[in-house]
Amino acid sequence: MFTEDMRIADYDPELSAAINAEKRRQEEHIELIASENYVSPRVMEAQGGVLTNKYAEGYPGKRYYGGCEHVDVAEQLAIDRAKQLFGADYANVQPHSGSQANAGVYLALAKPGDTILGMSLDHGGHLTHGAKPNFSGKIFNAVQYGLNPETGEIDYDQVERLAKEHKPKLVIAGFSAYSRVVDWQRFRDIADSVGAYLIVDMAHVAGLVAAGLYPSPVQIADVTTTTTHKTLRGPRGGLILAKSNPEIEKKLQSLIFPGIQGGPLMHVIAAKAVAFKEALEPAFRDYQQQVVNNARAMADAVKARGYKVVSGGTDNHLFLIDLIDKGVTGKDADAALGRAYITVNKNTVPNDPQSPFVTSGLRIGTPGVTTRGFKEKEVVELANWICDVLDNMGDESVVEKVREKVLSICRDFPVYRANAKSGAAL
């Protein structure tokens, strides 16, 4: 029997210390990793609740266990809200992650050994788009497209040429590090020209799509996948969406369960339902617009300081700084900024001479700082602090000065503000 006053701090001080240190890091450091964000207390409440106790193999109304009448309600809410949010005819909220969602879709629509065409990892694609170390590059014959070296944008002519040459079963559009609007219809036309399915991975821009600030692929692609965190600001998890096609829907349902997963994580699905409801609110669109405004302001400020931005700017929540001409590696820049309490991630850039473990670039994203309340004024300041550190690599006095500024602005813009009634922060 358990009592409600049981706490980790009283039972496991080592773990409690790590959790508290991470809470402190999130409040005191500026988060610029494009795939990270902060969830609301409501999302955390759902994810930390009693639904974690329930096993529920199957789907709402068709479970293999009894006692699922209440979790059925939670999952159906998540499904209905996802469909409403994205204008989809089909939604599966059970994938544990974006990678699981992609795996399920690929295996539902293609066989091992089939050819898939996806964006190269070193040009901005994701591991699951055919990278050699990933399952997608191991069990499928993966062909990769990239960016036009002149524009820094997707080379659609190359995509079309490779599609006609290799006749892929799946054409995969989407990215993990690309700052421009993707022409989903051009991908649709290319896929149709070779009889391929079009799969779109919109994990990075799902929040922008939901807000109507980025073109939606949902009624263009055969299947669309996404994570439920990043710009969508929900729990870590995956989501599959599709336009109406009973044959594809049946394949997707059976491939997720029992194909690659067993029992769904009902507490995470409940948290997804909360996040989807939050994303349906008018304030969510305002938030997403500020995310884009902040990314553009930061990119412009970085360029004004003499740094190269891949493709020259951004249309979404992220941009890439190319450090090749500066003679600075992404690894060293990442570490120096980390000491200044600015968290970014090293990232490969087009024609990168460094290995993926070193790189010559940085990926910068604004979802997290926008959740904190940063607007253009604050992010331009932040961009200049970043450039101060990069201009003075090896000078720890500059790092220290920037760190003090970071701590000050973080105090002014806490992630989790004190409760007006109790006076307690989360």
Curated annotation (Swiss-Prot):
The keyword Amino-acid biosynthesis applies. Its main location: cytoplasm. Keywords: Amino-acid biosynthesis, Cytoplasm, One-carbon metabolism, Pyridoxal phosphate, Transferase. GO terms for biological process: glycine biosynthetic process from serine; tetrahydrofolate interconversion. Pfam families: SHMT. It comes from the Bacteria. CDD domains: SHMT. (6S)-5,6,7,8-tetrahydrofolate binds at L121, G125, H126, L127, S355, P356, F357. The record marks H229 as: Plays an important role in substrate specificity. It is found in: Cytoplasm. It catalyses: (6R)-5,10-methylene-5,6,7,8-tetrahydrofolate + glycine + H2O = (6S)-5,6,7,8-tetrahydrofolate + L-serine. Pathway: One-carbon metabolism; tetrahydrofolate interconversion; Amino-acid biosynthesis; glycine biosynthesis; glycine from L-serine: step 1/1. PROSITE patterns: SHMT. Its EC number is 2.1.2.1. Its cofactor is pyridoxal 5'-phosphate. GO terms for cellular component: cytosol. It is an enzyme of class 2 (transferase). The modification N6-(pyridoxal phosphate)lysine is found at K230. GO terms for molecular function: glycine hydroxymethyltransferase activity; pyridoxal phosphate binding. Belongs to the SHMT family. Catalyzes the reversible interconversion of serine and glycine with tetrahydrofolate (THF) serving as the one-carbon carrier. This reaction serves as the major source of one-carbon groups required for the biosynthesis of purines, thymidylate, methionine, and other important biomolecules. Also exhibits THF-independent aldolase activity toward beta-hydroxyamino acids, producing glycine and aldehydes, via a retro-aldol mechanism. NCBIfam families: PRK00011.1. Homodimer. This is Serine hydroxymethyltransferase 1. It comes from Hahella chejuensis (strain KCTC 2396). The lineage of its organism: Bacteria, Pseudomonadati, Pseudomonadota, Gammaproteobacteria, Oceanospirillales.
